Structure formats: C-alpha cells, structure tokens
From Swiss-Prot:
Protein name per UniProt: Selenium-binding protein 2
UniProt KW Protein transport keyword: yes
A molecular-function term among this protein's GO annotations: selenium binding
Chain positions with Phosphoserine modification: S467
Compartments reported by the entry: Nucleus; Cytoplasm, Cytosol; Membrane
Domain of life assignment: Eukaryota
UniProt similarity note: Belongs to the selenium-binding protein family.
Tissue expr: Mainly expressed in liver.
Gene that encodes the chain: Selenbp2
Annotated InterPro entries: Se-bd
Keywords: Cytoplasm, Membrane, Nucleus, Phosphoprotein, Protein transport, Selenium, Transport
Length: 472
C-alpha cells in the first residue's frame, strides 16, 4: 500500500507509488441525454465498484446539470499529482466541460464523495467573451494550480484548438494559455511533459463538421485532422507540426507516465492505428506507426470496408501495457510496450461491436478473425454498441469500459444505443502474462435509468487515474 503523506498535496509522488494506491470504490461518469429523445439534462453518475458493497455495480447518485443538451464528454480535476508537493491543494472538484454547450461545470466531490453537488457553472458567454472560443473538451490541472481546458472551435463553429485557463480556486476564466493568434487549426486532446518543455495536442475536426454526424465526403475533402502539434511549454507556442502518414483523426494522446520520458502514443481513429511520437537525435520530434488494425471487408454496412475505429487509449502507470478500444469492431486490446517501437499483442476481448454474428453486417474478408464474434450477453442483457471509453485501475488489474462515443455518432453507428442506453463493463487484467477476461458479475445498464436510457461516457476515480494525472 502506498504511504500517504500527511503534509503533501493531491495524488502520489510517482506513477509507481500510485500503483500501490487503494482500490477504487466509486467511479464518476457523465451520462448524456442529448439526441436520445429524453428532454432531460445530462448528469454526473456515481457508480459503486466495491465488490464488498451491497450496491456493487449500481448507480448510487445522479447529479443533473441545470441545462439541457450540454453533451458532457470528458472530465478532469481542479488539481492532481502535478501539485503533489503543495499541501494547500486538495483534489475535491471535478471539471466537466460541455462539448456542445461550451459551458464548464465545476462539481464538488470533496464534501460528499458519494453524493457530488454542483459548485459553479462557467457560462459559455464568459468563455466566448474572454477567449473567443467554443466547444470545450479536455481538462487537465497544471502544477501552477490553474486548470486548462482545450477547445475545438471558434464562435462560428470553425476549427480552433485553443486552451482556456481557469483559476484553480475561484474558477474564473483567466484567458487563453497560448499566445494571441497562436491556436492550432483544430483541437481534441493534449498532454504535457514539463521536464522536456513540451506539450502535444491532437485534432478531430471543426465543430461544423462533426456536430451532426460522420460524413465520409468530409474525409475526402480533408476536413478531418491528421496532425500532432508540438508546443513549447514555457513559450506557449507551436514549435513543430507532425503530419502523420496514414494517421487520420488522431484523438487521445498520452506521454509515458514517467515524467522524464520523451515518447508516447496517439490513437488514430479512422485509420485505426497507434502511432508513437518521440524526441529524435536532433532534438526535434518525430512520429512513426507501430500498430495497425486492419479494416474488414463487409456487406450490409455504410461503407464496403469497416475500420476498427480506435477511440480511446490508455497506458498502465508502470508504462508496461498499452490498451485501446476498437469501437466499431468491438474489441479491447492489450499490448506489451516494454519495447515501445515494437508493441506486442498480449490480450484481446470482444465486448459487442458491429460485426457480431447474427447482426446486419456480414464480414466478407478478415485478416485477423476466422469467424465473426458472438454477441456479448451479460446478466441476460445483450450488449449494444462497442467498447469506447476505458479506464484502468491504479494497480492495472481491472479495466472498465463504457460504450457511448458521442451522441450524434452513436445515433448514426449504433442506433440501438439510443433506444437501449449504454452500459459499463469491467474486465479483469492479467498483468503477469497479459490477457483480458470479462467479469460476468459486473454490469451497469444505463438503459434502466429513471428518466430513460442514457449514454455514459468517460470514467474517473476520486483519487485520480491513468488518464487524469500527469507527473512533473
């Protein structure tokens, strides 16, 4: 068990110390009603994940937002392990940006962790007036005590990868992090590594492009991203743009957790590959493809070939394993990245997806499978959709997954999700030899929510996790 410092700040001194942290007992995740037909606000659900609890795998609390149609998406903290050395800091507020509304909600999870309450609403009008941006997305806490939230658009819905700074105590909007006029053309995710004076960010598409669903013609027109932007952390400006070969729609990007590392990985959704970015011998940054998921030739789908669609990636805290989800194919994969240049597949599990046997899609040619996977049934429920957002326990032994991507795309690719709601599943992980196995006793069915089926998204543990905490 990790030793808890009584005079330290939030989180843990190192990623390896974090692995010794306590087992997760509750999980927070946003649930979305936009595009479901239910006229109710999105809400933050609290789920009990303690096997010893009588409420195990149940929603124990729901905090509705005050407005409709926010499209809650990702979440972050007011402070995390980057402030471990500051005993005045406490991880007690969850930051919830609204992808469509551009509001940012600050939720108090410190007073009653099992019953969060709304602390503050940062209105879109304040963000727009001070920063001239919209479509708030990823939130990370900084060692300065500030919170940084990136954006995807300008006020007209064009692409604009900007970074909004919030005061970590008052949550007032302070302005943008990047220099005036220095935003990237588009945005999505970001990760920083101060020891090397660098931040990296990715790009999805302009809000006008993605907001109403996926149109293949937009890909042909070059309206989706394929670049990594490398920023000077101290000067707040782009110093390099990495144009990826065969790297369409780079979404989640992660440096290795080791704060001295000079490499990481990005998941490219549409081209369905994992690319490794790294500092080269010249001191600049390079990128190379290290994993490719082959598309499947299909019949009965919107296109003749179906990509895996890698939508989320995670690194274990010891930087040994890489995990990612193929939302369309329906599997989660585990790779040993002891040699980051040559990841080795060590585990794979199918949790639904678009190619299950007996569905509307027939696979004509498959480079990996000899037959279509069976539909997943857990506790008598056939699981709709495919695995999307994933979260790993601190010790690396449990992987949680939800099945909703973004309500407009859910509606298009998995209409069953809209009718039935998404689910939360749990997979047991073999951290010795590698391997993934479903826990048949765990199911959170968001199709049975009191106000109607809901779409659950990103998962957060109260004490921090593999995708929220950055060590400096």
């Amino acid at each position: 068990m990790a030793t808890k410092c009584t005079k330290c700040g939030p989180g843990y001194p190192t990623p390896l110390e974090a692995m010794k942290g306590p087992r997760e007992e509750i999980v927070y995740l946003p649930c979305i009603y936009r595009n479901t037909g239910t006229e109710a606000p999105d809400y933050l659900a609290t789920v009990d994940v303690d096997p010893k609890s009588p409420q195990y795998s149940q929603v124990i609390h729901r905090l509705p937002m005050p407005y409709l149609k926010d499209e809650l998406h990702h979440s972050g903290w007011n402070t995390c392990s980057s402030c471990f050395g500051d005993s005045t800091k406490s991880r007690n507020k969850l930051i919830l940006p609204g992808l469509i509304s551009s509001r940012i909600y600050v939720v108090d999870v410190g007073s009653e962790p099992r019953a969060p309450k709304l602390h503050k609403v940062i209105e879109a009008s304040e963000i727009q007036a001070k920063c001239n941006v919209s479509n708030t997305h990823t939130s990370h806490c900084l060692a300065s005590g500030e919170v940084m939230v990136n954006t995807l658009g300008d006020l007209q819905g064009n692409g604009k990868g900007s970074f909004v700074l919030l005061d970590g105590e008052t949550f007032e909007v302070k302005g943008t992090w990047e220099k005036p006029g220095g935003a990237s053309p588009m945005g999505y995710d970001f990760w920083y590594q101060p020891r090397h004076n660098v931040m990296v960010s990715t790009e999805w598409a302009a809000p006008n492009v993605f907001k109403d669903g996926f149109n293949p013609a937009h890909v042909e027109a070059g309206l989706y991203g394929s670049r990594i932007f490398v920023w000077d952390w101290q000067r707040h400006e782009i110093i390099q743009t990495l144009q990826m070969t065969d790297g369409l729609i780079p979404l989640e990007i992660r440096f290795l957790h080791d704060p001295s590392a000079t490499q990481g990985f990005v998941g490219c959704a549409l081209s369905s590959n994992i690319q490794r970015f790294y500092k080269n011998e010249e001191g600049t940054w390079s990128v190379e493809k290290v994993i490719q998921v082959p598309s499947k030739k299909v019949k009965g789908w919107m296109l003749p070939e179906m990509p895996g669609l890698i939508t989320d990636i995670l690194l274990s805290l010891d930087d040994r394993f890489l995990y990612f989800s193929n939302w369309l194919h329906g599997d989660i994969r585990q790779y040993d990245i002891s040699n980051p240049q040559k990841p080795r597949l060590t585990g794979q599990i199918f949790l639904g997806g678009s190619i299950v046997r007996g569905g509307s899609v027939q696979v004509l040619e498959d480079q990996e499978l000899t037959c279509q996977p069976e539909p997943l049934v857990v506790k008598g429920k056939r699981i709709p959709g495919g695995p999307q957002m994933i979260q790993l326990s601190l010790d690396g032994k449990r992987l949680y997954a939800t099945t909703s991507l973004y309500s407009d795309w859910d509606k298009q690719f998995y209409p069953d999700l809209i009718r039935e709601g998404s689910v939360m599943l749990q997979v047991d992980v073999d951290t010795v030899n590698g391997g993934l196995k479903l826990n048949p006793n765990f199911l959170v069915d968001f199709g049975k929510e009191p106000l109607g089926p809901a779409l659950a998204h990103e998962l957060r543990y109260p004490g921090g996790d593999c995708s929220s905490d950055i060590w400096i």
